[in-house]
UniProtKB/Swiss-Prot annotation:
Phylogenetic classification of the source organism: Bacteria, Pseudomonadati, Pseudomonadota, Gammaproteobacteria, Enterobacterales
PANTHER family: 40S RIBOSOMAL PROTEIN S11 FAMILY MEMBER, SMALL RIBOSOMAL SUBUNIT PROTEIN US17M
Organism, scientific name: Serratia proteamaculans (strain 568)
Subunit structure: Part of the 30S ribosomal subunit.
Name under which the protein is recorded: Small ribosomal subunit protein uS17
Family matches, as Pfam families: Ribosomal_S17
Molecular-function GO terms, alphabetical: rRNA binding; structural constituent of ribosome
Length: 84
């Protein structure tokens, strides 16, 4: 069995929870019939141990074991801080 940790990059859209945040992951998908590229967004709940992220920050996250009912991702690093 290989230990492959999935990492993604996204933008923080909510940080109101204690030690948690919601990250939006944007991807483009080609429409199966018309061929137009469409933006699709996935919202993931992420564990933030030190509460270091704010709304608008670009972060890198990694998949981990389930930490709660909705959280199975953890923060790796803050790529870019948001300009307030």
């Amino acid at each position: 069995m290989t230990d492959i940790n999935r990492t993604l990059q996204g933008r923080v859209i909510s940080d109101k929870m204690e030690k948690s945040m919601v990250v939006a992951i944007e991807r483009t998908v080609k429409h199966p019939i018309y061929g137009k590229f469409i933006k699709r967004t996935t919202k993931l709940h992420v564990h933030d141990e030190n509460n270091e992220c704010g709304i608008g920050d670009v972060v890198e996250i990694r998949e981990c074991r389930p930490l709660s009912k909705t959280k199975s991702w953890t923060l790796v690093r803050v790529v870019e801080k948001a300009i307030l």
